[in-house]
Amino acid sequence: MTQYTPMIQQYLKVKADYQDAFLFFRLGDFYEMFFEDAVKAAHELEITLTSRDGGSSERIPMCGVPHHAAKNYIEQLVEKGYKVAVCEQVEDPKTAKGVVRREVVQLITPGTMMEGRTIDEKENNFLAALTHFEDGSYALACNDLTTGQNTVTLLTGSVEDILLEVYATGSKEIVVDSTFSKDELNKLTETLKMTISYEDTTTIPEGLEHLVKSVSQAKLIKAIGRLFNYVIRTQKRSLDHLQPVEIYYTNQFMKIDVHSKRNLELTETLRTKEKTGSLLWLLDKTKTAMGGRMLKQWMERPLIQKEKVEERLEMVETFVNDYFLREDLKEKLKEVYDLERLAGKVAFGNVNARDLLQLRRSLLQVPAILEAISLLDNAYAARLIQGADPCESLTELLGRSIQENPPLSIKDGDIIKDGYNDKLDQYRYVSKNGKTWIAELEKRERDITGVKSLKIGYNRIFGYYIEVTKANLGALPEGRYERKQTLANAERFITDELKEKETLILEAEEKIVQLEYDLFTALREEVKVFIPKLQHLAKVISELDVLQSFATVSEEEQFVKPVLTNKREIFIKDGRHPVVEKVLNGKLYVPNDCIMPEKMDVFLITGPNMSGKSTYMRQLALVTVMSQIGCFVPATEAVLPVFDQIFTRIGAADDLISGQSTFMVEMLEAKNAIANASERSLILFDEIGRGTSTYDGMALAQAIIEHIHDQIGAKTLFSTHYHELTVLEESLDQLKNVHVSAIEENGKVVFLHKIQDGAADKSYGIHVAQLAELPESLIARAKEVLAQLEGQEEIVIPKRVEVKVPEVAPEPVVVKEEPAEIQETKVETEEESQLSFFGGEQSSKKQDKSVLDAKETAVLAQIKKIDLLDMTPLEAMNELYRLQKKLKKG
């Protein structure tokens, strides 16, 4: 290292402490990067890679960005998941002896970004910290540095379950200890695209103990300690805005796993991963950024306490019924800026004058908001605004201190109002009058010399000067001016009087800028005192904003207030899928009832593809979520229980973590529901069993239905293409067949999208294929095959027709007609086994008893004794398999 220059040695010493980050090393007006950082940054930022002499035999790779544009480049790197360590000059180069002292003043990471393109105003930017304990449990702590919010919870389950919970927080960065499993870290980085950071210290940092007063569990404190120590180590500044830690337990809220949230498209769509088209998109009529964030948090955690849900519903009803109150509140909320993040910027020391002006404008709305809510005859409203301080003294302070149109920078002056500080007023008087004197001097000198083009100007290098063109130099009185600068076409002069005024004016202007900066930083410290009150106000206003949002969308979309019941019954009259209805944009939407009495647990849904089975299932889930976050629901009448969990298996399986097959993911999701559901849960299973053979799929589907019906008792919607399962209605007294109806008109299918009692009589799959515009020849052949199948007593494989195939294709398998006797059957492949479910051609022919041997006659006798009406389909299939095996033994 001694081979390098002192400056490069300094760089390498700092870089050694930040190996996992880009080091932005301040050199004058630039941030420079060297060595590998330079090569990688030049590629990522698309900037020029150059080199410089660093004292060694080889030149050092180097790239840099201007300090005034660094924010944009830092955002680009952090957006890609990188970390950036900002190293500043911490002493004046003019007075430095040797190399200027430099220190890292902040480590900017995906989880600690305070502002920029990556920060959505209606999204939290959580940093997560995960701590693993020997008993298999985990503590998960989260912090949003932009708002100061802190949460912690205790989790149990498999590592993959825990990682999915972390993923559900939306965190872009997770802090773990250095012993955390490398395999699990790979899943976080490669699959979930999270940035990994390390922190081994778990004690609560000094000065932050007051934030964990409500936390007594040692496990939770360790997770919070890890989180806080990482934040302090990386940010290196005041964290006065950090809020007391909120403990939450997953059993206090409706549990909806990550897969179910995605399937239901609660906050983003499955296809585009965007908000537009999700339930959040529909319900978000909030007027403030903080209200938008609270709405999303409510949707992530629906309530399970009936009384709390009813309180919200009553408040929403109040807003629905009082149009003028609601509209007045909305108008005031429009003028409220993001109090939470403004408080964070105050604490962080990066608030500017415009931010404080936004704070004042927001506070001006608060008294009227609180007064309007206080007049409501509502206990929930009274409790909500209790202790809310409108901070009128802060409003007054900001009103008399900050200019109405201040500049963005706090170092350019013109921030503080006249009358706020006497000394500042004096400097401004000198500066203003001095400039007036300059203008008067210019006029006087023109009159004395007779040179009308004479002017007095200023630049930063030469100060004030009198400028006369060379053509007019002869008109100047001898000895009146002292020459200062010669130009190509003019001369510049100075006088003793002008020098004196210049000193006064420049000193005043310099002192004005410095004094304004000092006054602003002092003002910022005064505002810090109000941070807890501002954060409390933010919570109150956020909640009011969400409630008015529910009221607004409920009135616009004609939602109805649900009635919550302690009974296990569902009564939804004319229910609608709220998002589908909105997207149809005025087109006729077909509503559907969902009526499940206390003794009715399972709806077995059959019907055509594309008929609306999945929409109907999602519709019920969304209605329950909307109800339990306190919103009205899309129906003409709704009576609902309070569900503790929702489990779904709808649509294409989307495995976030393990890389399992689609069928395995389907089975794991089914297992999750079966293992964790209670009689207070809602289960939605769509086409379980499709990913395996027909026998296996049908057997699994029936076994799952029976288990839910007999052992769990959860309200369940189970859609299937296995029409054979509809006979379960005869043996399972709490199961009911329903179907989505369709009719045929002029050879075409018309989907009615209406749920009706009973099983569907046909699938209309060929009609769906026509809608997909499959080749007409293929459709014609499918219809021919279908006609042959439907014309037989049993399902059989129809005769093949000769089809021309490419020469490279294998020869077609031809079904050979055998004599009308039971043939010896070889062990079948999986494909053959699936085909054999439909039977061979010989199965449709009557057997000639004369050719049966004794064993076959005995089997026939056993078949005659079987009481099919007393067997489930699964038992029947097992019996058939046993008899077939007996025949094969020969």
From Swiss-Prot:
Record-linked Pfam families: MutS_I, MutS_II, MutS_III, MutS_IV, MutS_V
Q: Which SUPFAM superfamilies match?
A: DNA repair protein MutS, domain I, DNA repair protein MutS, domain II, DNA repair protein MutS, domain III, P-loop containing nucleoside triphosphate hydrolases
Q: Which residues bind ATP?
A: 607-614
The processes (GO biological process) annotated in the record are: mismatch repair
Question: What CDD domains does the entry give?
Answer: ABC_MutS1
Organism superkingdom? Bacteria
Q: Which InterPro entries match?
A: DNA_mismatch_repair_MutS, DNA_mismatch_repair_MutS-lik_N, DNA_mismatch_repair_MutS/MSH, DNA_mismatch_repair_MutS_C, DNA_mismatch_repair_MutS_clamp, DNA_mismatch_repair_MutS_core, DNA_mismatch_repair_MutS_N, DNA_mismatch_repair_MutS_sf
A single Gene Ontology CC term: cytosol
User: Among its keywords, does the record have Nucleotide-binding?
Assistant: yes
UniProt keyword Amino-acid biosynthesis present: no
The GO terms this record gives for MF are:
ATP binding; ATP-dependent DNA damage sensor activity; damaged DNA binding; mismatched DNA binding
Cite the entry's keywords alphabetically: ATP-binding, DNA damage, DNA repair, DNA-binding, Nucleotide-binding
Q: Which PANTHER family match?
A: DNA MISMATCH REPAIR PROTEIN MSH1, MITOCHONDRIAL, DNA MISMATCH REPAIR PROTEIN MUTS FAMILY MEMBER
What is the purpose of this protein? This protein is involved in the repair of mismatches in DNA. It is possible that it carries out the mismatch recognition step. This protein has a weak ATPase activity.
HAMAP family documented for this protein: MutS (MF_00096)
Q: Family membership, please give it.
A: Belongs to the DNA mismatch repair MutS family.
The name of this protein is DNA mismatch repair protein MutS
Species source reads Bacillus mycoides (strain KBAB4) (Bacillus weihenstephanensis)
Encoding gene (name): mutS
